[in-house]
Every structure is written in C-alpha cells, then in structure tokens.
Amino acid sequence: MQIVSVDIGSTWTKAALFAREGDALTLVNHVLTPTTTHDLAKGFFSSLNLVLNVDNALPLFNNGEVALKYSSSAKGGLAVAAMGLVPSITLETAKVTAHSAGAKIAQYYSYKLNRRDIQALEETQPDILLFTGGTDGGEESYGLNNARVLAESKLDCAIIYAGNRDIQDEVQEILGHKDLTIVDNVLPDLDHPNPLAARQAICDIFLKRIVKGKGLDVVVDKTGEEPMPTPWTVFELVKAISNVDHSWKEFMLIDMGGATTDVYSACANTLSPDTVLHGVPEPFVKRTVEGDLGMRVSAMVVGESAKELVNVNFAQQPAQLDAFYHYLRHLVAHPDYLPANAEEKYFDTVLAGLCVGYATERHAGTKKEVCTCVGNVDLQMGRDLTTVRKVVGSGGWLSRASPFDMHHWLKYRELNDDGKRILLPTEFEYYRDSRGLLPLLANVARVDPLAAARTSIQCLTL
C-alpha cells in the first residue's frame, strides 16, 4: 500500500510518498513547493502531482490505489481565545486543552470579562472561544456573568462552553443565539483535568467551519479527505512515539518555524522529595506554542524581548550588536532570506538559540524554595523535565542546522525573571529531524501509528 502525506505550511508545502509493508514504512519520494497562500488548493495539487510523478493524481486516490492524509497550519493556523476563572487553574487547563487540539492561543482572559476584553475579542474575532471556569458544583457567578456579557457582544466566532456543568442549562439559554457547543468540563475537579471532549469539539469546528475559511474546501471536495491541524497530528505522533519504544517514553520535541515555535513533551508528573505541586496536574503529553518566537516573521520581537541575553551573548563582540539588530530587521522585511556569509549564519544561530531557550522555558515548570510551618519545601509549578534524556529539533532551521549546541541554549537561563529554577532537561541526547519528515509521518500515524512512530525514530539524526 502507498500513502501520500502532505503538510501545508505558511511558507512551504511538503509532500512525501511512503510505501507501507506490514509495520514498515519506506520513503519513496519527498518534495517541497512554495505554499500558494492566495489559493491553497493550487499548491496542494501541484505537490501531489510532483510527489507521485503524474499529471493528475486524483484518479489514484479515487480508485484506492494510493491513500491520502494531509494537514495544514497555513493562513495562521487555528486561533483560539481561552477564558477561565483562576489563571493557574481553569484558565491554564483551557490553554493546555487548546494547545493539545493544535490551536494557538490568540488571547486569554480570567475572572470577569470587562468592556476592554469584549472590545479586543470583537476586533480580533478568533476562530474559537473556549469558555471555561469553575469545577463541577463550584463557582457559578463568574461564568454566568461572562455568558451574559458575551451574549450582548458582536463576537461572531464559535463558542465552546467547557466549564461548571451545573450552569450548562443557563449558559445554553443565555448564549443560544450564538454558535454555541456545550461539552464536558475541562476541570470537573482539581485533581482530574478532562480535556478530551473540548479537544474533540475544537477539531470538529475546525473541520466544519474553518476549513472553508482557510481555502481548503476545494481540496476536501475533490479528494473526499478532510485535513487536520498540523500541531494536532504532531501531538498524536508524540504520543505514539512515547508508546512504541520504552527508551522514548519521555522526550521533548521543539518545532521551530519562521513565525512560531512549538514545544511538545512526553513526561510523567513526578515530584522529587520535599516538593509540593502548585496548580493542576498536567497531562503526560503537553504542547505549547509561542507566537512571538520565530526565525523570520517574529525575528525582531525575539530580539527586543531577549535584549538582556542578546547583550550578554555579544559582550565580547560589541561591534556586532548593531549588525545583529540590522539583520533581524532585514529578516522581518524579507522572510524568505537565507544567510549569505559566516556572520549572518552566526546571527541565525543566536536567533535560533533565543527562540529555543525562551520557548522551552515557557513550556517547562519552575521550582522555588518556600518556608512553611513544617520547614522549607520546594514549590513546583508545571512539569519537571530535568530527567528527560532525549530532545528532538524539527522545523526548517533546526532540521538543517548541524551542529547546533542545544545543551548551551537550554541551560542559558537557569532562573527565570522571578528567581525560580527552570526545570528543563540537563543531560540529554540531541536528535535532528534532518529531512523534515515528522509532520508528514504524523499524518501517516492517523492510518498506522505504530509504523509511523517507529519510522519517526529511525529517521532522526544524532
């Protein structure tokens, strides 16, 4: 059996043809073409024809000779506004849920919505508003207040209510005239997050409503196959890899693009002795996405946000500092630009390191010693990745860059701005997705997760 996998990115559309025999996958062909943002279908079908070396690939899919799976993060991906009650509890659970569904958080709100919040939502119009807050049987007034405020707003996006089940009927009555979906609470009680129903609802809305807005309805009509958000498929691949090979049970994957940096980790919620967890337990597999950390479109934002670290990095070469910022401004104006000399290659390395460092810092948990009535204890928020022994770099620059000192950039900041220890991997092997196959194998995992996971491990380069 042959499987074609296509991933439509913001800049490039990647396609691969795999031959499947039993539990083994063999790469037959692999092509890269520019994404036709004005008409995604045009570039998509061009990639299909190229990877299959035919003039018209559609008959091969229609008669069952070749299977097709594809994903997309083009045109900004899936933008979700997350709303919860307490920032470190229900709001954090809402953000984790949205990220696991392949979305990026466009905005987030806690407690009661005010006039400025509503104005911001109306102006940006996210694809979906994930409305959470309150455990089952818990706080009701904030959720009801926010429902009434939303009902009077001009917000026109899909709304998923995944909060306190005790007010589901009232929320339905208040927001019934909106595009409303009600699902199980993402946090029915403080010890048991429940993201699955909301995650599936986000995916369903992506397929029913957003595919057309992203210009993929033509592809669906002609192929009969529906796309998935690229980060969703990669998230599922991370789970499959963790399940298929014990030596890969726990690992971290960094997927860095021109505009964003995604971080995935598979890691158990373990606490070291004399450590207390603050907040909600995290899922075994977690994804975060940083919309301000990227190698091209977001380059200047990275440079401004990380000025202190930039100054430290160029302390021995102060003359290069102005040249570095000039280079970043050039990248923003010309996102397709590739470095032309050794200095610019070095600047790219520094920029990549800053993206990696900050994205992983925001993904990882933190720990700080506090004094209690029973003595000093470590207060931990989030996940402890210090025992993770494998880190993978993917995405255009990280896939190509060899060598890249991942160890240096993960330990560049041991403490965050609040003086808390950042719980990132310390001793690990660094692997590269050198051929950029992971997003493509993630699509294949929808057909055969076992074979896709094994092939993913085999294709990595130390």
Report each predicted region and the residues it spans.
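Nucleotide/phosphate-binding catalytic cleft detector across ATP-hydrolyzing
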Residues: 1-5, 21-24, 28-38, 42-45, ...
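Short polar catalytic/cofactor-binding loops
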Residues: 8-12
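Short beta-strand scaffold segments in enzyme catalytic cores
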Residues: 13-19, 80, 256, 261-266
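Short acidic (Asp/Glu) and glycine-rich catalytic loops that position anionic groups and cofactors
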Residues: 24-27, 286-288, 330-338, 416-422
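Glycine-rich phosphate-binding loop of actin/hexokinase-like ATP-binding domains
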Residues: 239, 246-319, 403-427
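Hydrophobic alpha-helix feature that most strongly marks membrane-spanning transmembrane helices
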Residues: 261, 265-268, 298, 361-368, ...
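A glycine- and small/hydrophobic-rich beta-loop-beta segment
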Residues: 304-369
